[in-house]
Design a protein with these regions (language model features):
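Sequence-specific dsDNA recognition surfaces
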Residues: 11-46
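Short, positively charged
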Residues: 89-109
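A short beta-sheet element
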Residues: 43, 48-96
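Non-catalytic DNA-recognition/assembly elements of restriction-modification systems
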Residues: 1-25, 125-181
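Short, functionally important structural connectors and interaction interfaces within domains
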Residues: 5, 12, 27, 31-33, ...
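Structured loop/turn residues at beta-strand edges in well-structured enzyme cores
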Residues: 8, 42, 119
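A short glycine-rich beta-alpha junction/loop motif
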Residues: 69-77, 108-135
Length: 181
């Protein structure tokens, strides 16, 4: 009998270099090798499942070993990680950060939640602290395996990001000064 799907901390999400939609049916019987052939999956690629539950929460989960049978209830995608780490806590802070409205206008989107689509995520310019600082912040929430991006109080990783908002604002002000000068 197959093991349950292994969930890993979402702190391990990296900047999305390339997103690829995957038909749900493919996971019901395919091995990683078959998926590699079909979708050009590479060694360090990570598969993300996005599940929509009856209570309206949308959950993202990372799956490292696609040899395990995976049957998502909604949609899935493959991401190709880049070297610069970006964690969901940080992404959430950015999406609720006032200057992100400028990004929304540039992408011609009507709602911030659309920024979470694979196409839009790859275009986001998120000001990032050093990787060590991101890891330190994310390690506080190491036990958190899933994040509901749409409800601030649904998950402790989202409840405690106010310090990141301050950091984002400082980054934004610094960038603005550099552009003006």
């Amino acid at each position: 009998m197959k093991d349950k799907i292994p969930f890993v901390p979402l702190k391990e999400i990296a900047t999305i270099k390339q997103g690829l939609s995957v038909r749900s049916k493919i996971w019901k019987s395919s091995t990683r090798e078959e998926i590699e052939d079909l979708y050009g999956l590479q060694k360090n690629d990570v598969v993300i499942l996005r599940k929509m539950y009856s209570n309206g929460k949308k959950i993202a989960a990372l799956v490292e070993d696609t040899k395990i049978v995976v049957v998502p209830s909604a949609s899935s995608m493959i991401i190709r990680p880049d070297t610069t780490k970006i964690f969901p806590l940080y992404l959430k802070a950015f999406l609720e950060f006032l200057p992100s409205d400028k990004v929304i206008k540039e992408l011609k989107l009507t709602s911030k939640k659309h920024l979470l689509s694979k196409g839009s995520l790859s275009k986001l310019l998120v000001p990032l602290p050093p990787v060590t600082e991101q890891i330190a912040l994310s390690d506080k929430y190491d036990k958190v395996k899933t994040v509901d991006f749409y409800h601030r109080y649904a998950n402790p990783i989202i409840e405690q990001y106010d310090s990141l908002m301050k950091f984002l604002w400082n980054c934004y002000q610094t960038d603005k000064k550099d552009i003006i000068s």
